[in-house]
Design a protein with these regions (language model features):
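Hydrophobic packing positions in regular secondary-structure scaffolds
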Residues: 1-265
Length: 265
């Protein structure tokens, strides 16, 4: 997520034409894939817009599902291309790509296809990914829940330092927003948060409780973004947990989400 923020603000060379030349070369798929690995996904996303349909379809096959998903997550700023690119994939292929994306990024893509195609794609997604997407869609456009990501780390407050680190590593395989670790009690109620650095430097003999910030801010999913945007701007945290009415963590609102909301205001 942070890479996405940086790619929007840091000035850099336009590599799209270089990438196009690589893709239009007569090199093997393996060689092209190796050359593409030297470029940032945002640059490849820019290059895709310059390709003809046949070359794009070849590119999707070269990239594979995971890499295509990373690249498609950078298309949200150019929605006019999204529907065309998605229809170049079969429904099953497109659904596979969406499953590999963060749910909020998948929603950004789905928002830019027809209602019929949206429902078809969602119906072909695996249950966990589908549930995350449907959760976000269950909130109105102006509610926090509609802007949240389901990419977060959550652990129990009764773990030892060693157990907490082990749980972090396990969850990080699927969730890469690791800078802030959310904490719940035995009833799955939000308890607080831990800064990643504090967990890394903690000694095994310390109690997890000693590094939990129980006053860490949170918001409710049904809150209006417009009504709490000023409060959110005051926080410098990478992310803030989003709770349901039972104070269970269902998502997170990230710094990039807040920046986008401020820009819209």
């Amino acid at each position: 997520m942070m890479n996405k923020i940086l790619s929007n603000v840091v000035m850099h060379k336009d590599y799209s034409k270089d990438i196009v030349r690589v893709l239009r070369s007569s090199k093997s798929d393996e060689v092209i894939r190796k050359k593409l690995s030297k470029y940032h996904e945002n640059d490849i996303a820019d290059a895709i817009k310059l390709l003809d349909k046949d070359t794009r379809i070849r590119l999707y096959k070269i990239l594979g599902v995971d890499w295509t998903a990373e690249i498609f997550s950078y298309l949200e700023d150019t929605p006019e291309y999204i529907e065309e690119f998605m229809t170049e994939l079969s429904v099953d292929e497109a659904a596979d790509v969406l499953e590999k994306m963060d749910a909020d990024d998948a929603v950004d893509i789905l928002d830019n296809v027809s209602e019929e195609e949206r429902q078809a794609l969602i119906s072909h997604m695996e249950k966990d990914a589908k549930d995350d997407v449907c959760l976000i869609y269950s909130y109105d456009d102006d509610e926090i829940g509609n802007k949240m990501t389901t990419n977060f780390i959550c652990i129990n407050n009764k773990l030892t330092i060693k157990e907490a680190m082990k749980e972090l590593v396990a969850q990080a395989e699927e969730n890469d927003n690791v800078n802030t670790i959310y904490v719940v009690d035995d009833n799955n109620i939000y308890y607080g948060a831990i800064d990643l650095k504090d967990l890394i430097v903690a000694r095994d003999y310390q109690k997890l409780e000693d590094i939990i910030s129980t006053s860490y801010p949170y918001v409710y999913a049904h809150e209006k973004m417009s009504e709490c945007i000023e409060d959110l701007k005051d926080y410098s945290e990478d992310s803030i947990p989003v709770l349901n009415k039972d104070k269970e963590i269902i998502g997170a609102i990230t710094s990039s989400d807040i920046i986008e909301a401020v820009d819209e205001e």
